[in-house]
Structures are given as C-alpha cells and as structure tokens.
Amino acid sequence: MKRYFVLAVVALGLVFTACDEEENLNSSVWIGSESESNVIAQLDTLYLDARIENLSGAMRYLWTVDGKKVSTASTYKFSQPKTGEYVIGLAVSDDKGENLQTTMTAKVEGRFGKGAFILNEGNMGNETGTLTFVDSKGIAVDSAYYRVNQTLLGNVCQDLFISDNKMYILSQNGAKNGGEGLLTIANATSLEKEKVYDNTTLSWPSNLAVVGENLYIRDNNGVYMLDTSTEVLTFVEGTKGALKNRMAVVGDKAFVMGNKQLFVIQNGAVIHTVSFESALSGVAKTYDGNLWVSCTKPASIIKVSPVDYKTIDSHTLNVSIGAGWGVAPAFSAKDDIIYFSNAGFKLYRHVFSQNETEEVADIKEYVEDAGIYYNSLGVDPVSGEVYFA
C-alpha cells in the first residue's frame, strides 16, 4: 500500500517532560485505498479514506480533485468517466488549528477495450440511440457513450464500425430528440468523443464502412464517400440499388451488397461488380482475409476472393439464410463457423471446413417472452459467444 505523508513539525521547549514528549509526536496524514491501487477503469470507483496519526479531537476533512472541492467526509469515492491522471488532494485539520495536507495521483484507464458493443436504435418518436457495452466478465454498461460524454447519440442509430481504434456510429435522423448528429466518431477504447458530423444531403443513411480516412455511407440513393480530412461528401457513381445492409472491408476495398451483385469500391469508385445467381443476404470478411457471402435461393454460403473475385468454395445449405427486414447480415462468423437464424428464433451454425450444418439452440427456450428477431446476431471473435437481438 502506498502512503502519502506530510509531517507537521512541532516546536519543542527547552525543558522536556514526559507530558511534552507525548504532545510533540510528529503528526501525519495519508490517503488510504481499499484496493491498495491508484489505477481504475472509467466509471469504476476507487474507495479512499483519510488515515491519520497523532491528531486528536474533532477532525475536519476536505477532498479535492484537480483543485476542485468534492467532499468533506472522512472517506471519498473517486470515479471519473474520462481517462487521464487526476490529482486527489486531502486536507485535515483538528480543533487545535493544526492543518495537514497530502495528495495522490489516480490514473483512469479506458474501460471498453475488451468486450462487445450493442447498438440500440431507440424509439424514433421520443428517444435517441444508445450504446451498451458488455465486458469480458459479462458485466453490462448501459448507455455507455452517454455516461462518458454526457451527450446523446443521433436519432435511430443504424450501424457501427471500428477502425484504427476509432468508433464510427451512424444514425438515420441525426440531431433529433436531443441527439448530437448524424455521425459520431469516438475513441474505441474510451468512447471519448472526437468529432460529430451532420449532413442534410443524405437520405436515411443506414450503413457505413471505413477505409483509412474515407467513410462509405449507404443511403436511399446509393453509396457516398465522406473524406474525413476535408469533410467533403461525394456520391459513388454506379452504386444505385445498394442494399440496406452492412458492408465489408478487406484491405483498401469496400464490398457493398446489391440485389444479386456485390459492388467493389476502391478510392471512391466502383472498380468491379461481382454477380451472383440469387439475391444476397449478407457479406463479411473471413478469418483468413477473404469474403463470406450468403445467398437466399438456393440458400448458400460462398467464400469469395477479394483479389480476383472468384469463388473459392460454395456450400448449399439445407435451411434458409435470410436477413429479414433488418440492416445487418444474415449471419455472423468466428473462424470457419458461420452462425445464422433466417431472421427467426432457431439458431444454426455451419462449419465450413466440414460442410456441416446443425441447429444450435431455440432462443425461445432461453427467452420465454421473445416476440421478434429484431435486427441481427453477432459472434464474439474471441470468446465465440453469440449475441442475439
């Protein structure tokens, strides 16, 4: 345990007695920590207390954080939503007028580096979107973005993309019902806001992908490219009919679903179109840098090269693999295992290396009042846990 001492020097008389020795012991105060640590994660609590030697009588306490008064109790619960180092001060005085002071430095680290994010669009009429975080221990932090920044995400949040430790959150209606804007950019580890964009050109934007400083945003007209360095928004010609669904990024290319085709976008232009025999229901990057593509009729999972756009392998499924009315792919994958539900409550997985499909679970057996498959399912790429919305 670290101790932070301040010694008070007491003047000694020329004549020493037993009583004088007791009264002239050095007094000290330090800040104690219940956890014996001065490091916490955002929104966690550091339990501190004043520890005193050789002071008696009525005590008065004053706690400060970076010079601002925060408490007059003998204990203090330190918690902060923002990362960084904070100087915690403690001043103690007794009824004889003796004053002691000490300080310590507490470090607040990013909380959101390991876990899963759940984006909730919220009620369009009177709410905004919210972001929930579930850490690796299963502890959920609701409205995590608001707790950190004290501002609200945009109205009807639609999609989230993480790239280079930045999080991009897209909303459909932007600054409505108190929302801060159409697109929010935040640090992915701390959720601390970096920038907010609003734009009246876009018509109900639904999905985004990030390649370097360029953002590809799909709306009712097609796909636009937003250069974040200049804030210039440009329509990508040839993307009319882009589906309301997530895009995939491999290298410097973005892959966008059309009805029976996949648009390949590079440097703000469509450089290729990959055609398929049936309607697409999902696209995602594979564990080995290729693409998973799901088709509806016949139900199938196809592995596609992002370099020459040829089919590496294709498996026909014995159950349907539709995306429903949501804005997310029909499937989610970890390694070569693809999970899907056909927008229903029965969860399936297809092991691509073995070309085998099996039913994993009936969600209604776990959630009795489940009424609707709302938008998507996702698989934690580390733990393999499946999140079902």
Segments (PLM) and residue ranges:
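Bacterial Sec-dependent N-terminal signal peptides
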Residues: M1-I40, A50, K96-A116
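Solvent-exposed loop segments of extracellular immunoglobulin-like
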Residues: N54-L62
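Surface-exposed, flexible coil segments in extracellular/virion-facing regions
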Residues: Y61-Q80
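Hydrophobic/tyrosine-rich beta-strand signature of extracellular beta-sandwich/beta-rich modules
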Residues: G89-L90
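Conserved beta-propeller blade signature
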Residues: G115-L119, K166-I169, N214-I217, K253-V256, ...
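Short glycine/acidic-enriched loop and turn motifs that connect beta-strands
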Residues: G122-N126, N173-G178, G222-Y224, Q261, ...
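A short beta-strand motif characteristic of beta-propeller blades
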Residues: I139-L152, E192-N199, T230-G238, G268-S275, ...
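Repeated scaffold domains used in trafficking and secretory/extracellular systems
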Residues: Q150-I162, T201-G212, G241-G251, E277-G289, ...
